[in-house]
Amino acid sequence: MRFVDEATITVRAGNGGNGCVSFRREKFVPRGGPDGGDGGDGGSVILRASNRLLSLYDFRLQRNYEAPNGQGGMGSQCHGRKGDDLTVELPVGTQIYEVTEDGETLLCDLSDPETVFVVAQGGRGGKGNEHFKSSTNRAPRFAQKGETGEVRSLRLELKILADAGLLGLPNAGKSTFISKVSAARPKIAAYPFTTLIPNLGVMIDDADPEQRLVIADIPGLIEGAHTGQGLGHRFLKHVERTRFLVHILSVEDVSLDSPDGPWSGFDLINEELVRFDADLGQRVQLQVVNKIDLRDPEDVQALRDRAAADGRTVHFMSALTGEGVEDVVAEMWRMRDELDIHEALVRLRETEEFDEEESDIEVIWVRE
């Protein structure tokens, strides 16, 4: 599936139906008076967050969305039918901006599944001439026109909502890893910046197929990413919506003889994260050294010993041969489950604190 994280669309709500000018005409009722019905309201455009979608690609193909108009009023006080609302499904994590001549305004953030937002309100139907009769005008020959529905130009921006975000320097083997542990098929080649757009993969627990772990393969980051270098801003925004990070470094970028230390590659990217958003520096992180098949076992063991001496938890694997991959995957599942428990405890604590608060509303019971 091609991943698209930005799109521009136009939404148009339906116009309200016009009120009707009509007079009652029946046998034995020579002066029946006005009986024009009201027009129906126009349909609204509603946005809904859906887990079924993972990209904004469809919105590059269809850019205009229009809800039906309301039906006009009819005689015998018959009201027009309301236009059906148009519901547009968007991926969870989509931010909606209204584009005007003065700039952009954030309207809503569809960060939770099934969140709905009325982005364009349908026009109200006009009133029929029966509403305008009076003591001085017993037979009004006019009715109210329906209101025009709202029209908005929107910019959609998707920030990936994933359990794990894969990040690291270019050519670290992130795409190879996600292709091994999921059904994702990203472009893989032996040169930097092979991945130019984020890729999504889903790991399914064999013991419980209902348990899934969504992985986002973030394109490689370089020094200066927080200032936009190497499309850094465009890639870093996706890191914000991940629950924990899997930081992958190629063994080619790890050297015991480096003056900055063997783990300088990890430190470089972490510094870019902090400069972009201080909260990202506190994100739970799993550090992995990949491509160990390119080094002798003795060299890899020396790196393991150095990590232990530095008090650093580093996993070693080869995504190409599969060595060490199972251990990394097991640790990812453990981190996800641990975060689930932590978030549940936080919600429980918030609920308990809320229950303990004294209400300043006095309730009086009345028996009828």
Swiss-Prot record:
Main location class: cytoplasm
Names of the cofactor(s): Mg(2+)
Cell compartments where the protein resides: Cytoplasm
Cellular component GO terms held in the UniProt record: cytoplasm
Domain of life: Bacteria
Residues annotated as binding Mg(2+): S175, T195
Sample GO molecular function, one term: GTP binding
PROSITE patterns listed in its UniProt record: G_OBG (PS51710), GTP1_OBG (PS00905), OBG (PS51883)
TM segment ranges: none
Keywords noted in UniProt: Cytoplasm, GTP-binding, Hydrolase, Magnesium, Metal-binding, Nucleotide-binding
Domain Obg stretches: 1-161
Binding annotation for GTP: 168-175, 193-197, 217-220, 290-293, 318-320
Subunit text: Monomer.
Described purpose of this protein according to its UniProt entry: An essential GTPase which binds GTP, GDP and possibly (p)ppGpp with moderate affinity, with high nucleotide exchange rates and a fairly low GTP hydrolysis rate. Plays a role in control of the cell cycle, stress response, ribosome biogenesis and in those bacteria that undergo differentiation, in morphogenesis control.
Family annotation (NCBIfam families): Obg_CgtA (TIGR02729), PRK12297.1 (NF008955), PRK12299.1 (NF008956)
Family: Belongs to the TRAFAC class OBG-HflX-like GTPase superfamily. OBG GTPase family.
Protein name according to UniProt: GTPase Obg
